[in-house]
Amino acid sequence: MTQPLDIDLPADHRRLALNILRAHLPQSIKAWVFGSRATRRARRYSDLDLAIDAGRRLTLDEIARLTEAFSDSDLPHRVDLVDWHDIDDRWRQTIMAERVALTEAAHPDAAG
């Protein structure tokens, strides 16, 4: 179950990640943090794991633009992107067990 935003990531880094997502993908996407930042076991330079659900599979161009934007950003850590529509059910279950909503659309009380 998705939890309220309680992740091991400073607010300015959250805003930066959201701004990058919004600049390259439709506003209606759902994005979740998972991994060590969602479980609050991150170390200083732990990567940021993001699962993205655009309602469809992301294009290679979208993934490339996002990867480049995150790489060129001021975030002090690597961002690993996972396309929700490009993973198997086992991987989805693993992510669902610890995910924390990053976007409003990903919150459990959001419409859709």
Model-predicted segments: where are they?
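Catalytic core of pol beta-like nucleotidyltransferases
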Residues: M1-K30, A38-R44, A54-G112
